[in-house]
Every structure is written in structure tokens, then in C-alpha cells.
Regions:
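N-terminal glycine-rich flavin-associated loop
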Residues: 111-130
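Phosphate-handling active-site elements
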Residues: 105-107, 130-133
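Amphipathic, small/basic residue-rich leader segments at the start of a protein or domain
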Residues: 1-112
Length: 133
């Protein structure tokens, strides 16, 4: 089997690597500290972190959002709840992109590619009603 990446997948992998290096890794320690302090103080660690929300917006702007979804996924719900995007990558092409995300514990969250959300989105996209999508 040929595991060569298509140029589009190689480009996405390289862009994800650069984003992780330039944007995510520099804030990891501070984010970990904030999360730890919230948990230790009994605070709600599920409250969206404004720094992470900012990085998510940047990732979306750069076309690095929901890379696991089929191409051209869109709609009212998708726009409202941030599930739009998608590149239609094969598993072979997505694997190195996911590997690049794996360099940071925050990256899957920033790129909206974290489990179990990815699987849930794929199931709803394929089998859900228009409202669920």
C-alpha cells in the first residue's frame, strides 16, 4: 500500500505543525496551570478558556478546523455551533495531520478534533436529521 501523502494533506500537516509550534506550545504551561488551579479550587474546569477560544477562532480562520469531517460540511447548525469545515481526508491522509496535533495536549481541542466529539459529529453528520446536523 502506498502511504504517500497527497499534496493537500501534506500542506495541512505542515500548517498544523506550524500552528502547534507557533501558537499552542507557547501557552501550554499557562493553560495547564489555569486548568489545575480551577480543579483544585473546585471551580468548573469545563468553562471555556478565553485563550483556547481565541486559538480556536484562529484555527478556523486558517482552515484548520474539523479536518476529519467530509469536505464542504456546512449549514445553519454548523455555523452556529462550530461544526463547519471538513477536508474530506482519507484515513491515510488524516493520520499524519492527527499525529502533528498529538504534539500538544491542547491541539485536538484547539482544532476541534478531540474524542469523543469527532465520532459523535461523524455519526450525526451521516445519520442525523437536518436539525441534529
Amino acid at each position: 500500500m502506498d502511504f504517500s501523502l497527497f499534496p493537500r494533506a501534506a500542506d495541512l500537516r505542515d500548517r498544523v505543525r506550524a500552528f502547534v509550534t507557533d501558537e499552542i506550545e507557547p501557552i501550554e504551561a499557562a493553560a495547564h496551570t489555569r486548568i489545575t488551579r480551577l480543579r483544585e479550587s473546585g471551580g468548573d474546569s469545563w468553562t471555556p478558556d478565553p485563550v483556547i477560544k481565541g486559538l480556536q477562532a484562529k484555527a478556523r480562520e486558517q482552515g484548520l478546523w474539523n479536518l476529519f469531517l467530509p469536505a464542504a460540511h456546512a449549514g445553519t447548525y454548523a455555523a452556529d455551533f462550530g461544526t463547519d469545515g471538513g477536508e474530506g481526508l482519507s484515513n491515510v491522509d488524516y493520520a499524519p495531520v492527527a499525529e502533528a496535533m498529538g504534539r500538544s495536549f491542547l491541539a485536538p481541542l484547539v482544532f476541534n478534533s478531540n474524542a469523543p466529539d469527532t465520532g459523535n459529529m461523524e455519526v450525526l453528520l451521516k445519520y442525523g436529521t437536518d436539525e441534529q446536523r
